[in-house]
């Protein structure tokens, strides 16, 4: 009986405290809103799907998506805390940390990879008839021919970003030194408009903007990024340092929701719906037919060059778990490219920087809880358009032998 009275007294006291807190203007703090940025590109799909299909809500996180104008804006907002994280170029944190794309030493953390493949290099109509689809042998002569009557300029989306590196790798494989042409930075959604007014002769960007250029007759797809390196790392979930260190439970739940979205996206029957959602003005704001076609692996090349069908290396988001592991070796590879192309004068401490910026332990924890196989790392690998093997344990040997 005494215990019953004691429990009743505690309940009354608890209720009184709640009433007192409300009357004094106090309230239970609301759940924190997590703000994630994205650039209007087809591969922002994991964030859009996690939001639209309720995966963020399923894992108990209140996520607000923020459409951003450029990768530079994304960088600044992650670093100053306006964004907790974003759909980001995988190599951006390395570019920023090494001082190529931002203030040296600035830390942006990579939590997981969101996508492979699905980017391309588009050439203007000036190159129509001079070079065909995936024809690398004729590019140098075509550049020389166009250069006879105008300066040849190529655009990418962020210094040291993935598109910058795909462009430089393509130029090198074609026998064109990247220092012999102009390379400028243009935000992804502005690429087509800039080519239309003749601001550049080619660009490297993510979809759907290559597809839009081809369907509008402004340019044609010369090569897709998966032809440069099949199943390459492309976009990642990149977060600010504070979010990665002080709010790990929320971050883990964001990652779980994104993994579920990535799985959903790799069911091909879902891609039509994904394209429809992405095409909305508040997301990518591009023709649904163009988004859908390239999501399904169908590339209308443009310039009367026909259609290329990709069967197993179109844009991938999960691929039985192969996509999502953020490998240390990938970070080392991108930093090796910076040295290869003279973007850095002094070699960084490759392992130290990669391990500092990639949250391998956190990803492994989340992956195991979601039954995602963590991929083996630090093994040598080779891209499609190079003959030289990259050994992440010896980047200097690769740099010495790679075409510049």
What is each model feature region?
Residues 1-31, 375-377, 381-388, 392-404:
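Short, low-complexity disordered leader/linker segments with a strong preference
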Residues 28-184, 197-213, 218-231, 383, ...:
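Short, glycine-/small- and polar/acidic-enriched structural segments
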Residues 41, 68-72, 87, 158-162, ...:
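Soluble non-cytosolic domains of exported or imported proteins
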Residues 121-122, 236-239, 243-244:
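Short glycine- and hydrophobic/aromatic-rich loop-to-beta-strand nucleating segment
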Residues 246-359:
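Secondary-structure end/capping motifs
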Residues 332-404:
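Conserved C-terminal helix/tail region of periplasmic/extracytoplasmic solute-binding proteins
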